């Protein structure tokens, strides 16, 4: 169920285009594009680079305070499982996440 590299969107696209692209891929696999998943992808797309779950949560909650930290973690887990997001451990600190589709 991973999104294959050949399916990646072209580089230099807007965050909205990435959200739409990921949504299409998820729906084609029978997955839902939830509000939490959309918010996580938007945060990663807008802020770029490697963000911790707490960084992502701060960005998400600034845009939509009704999304809880546990929802962000669930969205990150689901998106990582689907190959949309990758997480890395840099040293002994918290894991960081980035979009693998871009």
Enumerate the predicted regions with their spans:
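Non-DNA-binding regulatory cores of transcription-related proteins
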Residues: 81-102
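A short acidic, leucine-rich amphipathic alpha-helix
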Residues: 55-61, 72
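Short, Lys/Arg-enriched N-terminal segment that forms or immediately precedes the first helix
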Residues: 17-29
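Basic amphipathic alpha-helical segments that dock to polyanions
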Residues: 72-82
